[in-house]
Amino acid sequence: MIRFETMAELVKLAEEKAVPLSEIVIRSEAENTQQSRFAVLVAMEENWEVMKEAIQRGVTNRERSVSGLTGGDAAKLFIRQKEGGYLGSAALATAAYALGVSEVNAAMGRIVACPTAGSC
């Protein structure tokens, strides 16, 4: 059984087995979910695609949530980040991505809630 609770324990396991950290995490997930390694990788790929779609939708659409209280701000921020600014393009783009996913979530769009959508 693969068990770790801290980064130090994860690093130690990876060193003992001479594999990357990611491999330990994949093996742990396969074990915990009783799925094959391949099934875990397929699920990870599907989640990654949903994450990318939510980001893209969030920074390009100006749709409002059902309540009308949120929506469109991520697209504005994404446009602004191309101009640079005080925080720099990378930080503004990251903020736009996070805000975009939050807005997609508020508009009842599809996101990956990992580890929780509560932060949105």
Question: At which residue positions do the language-model features occur?
Answer:
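Generic N-terminal targeting/processing segments that precede catalytic cores or assembly contacts
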Residues: 1-109
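Conserved phosphate/anionic-ligand binding catalytic regions in large, soluble enzymes, centered on
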Residues: 108-120
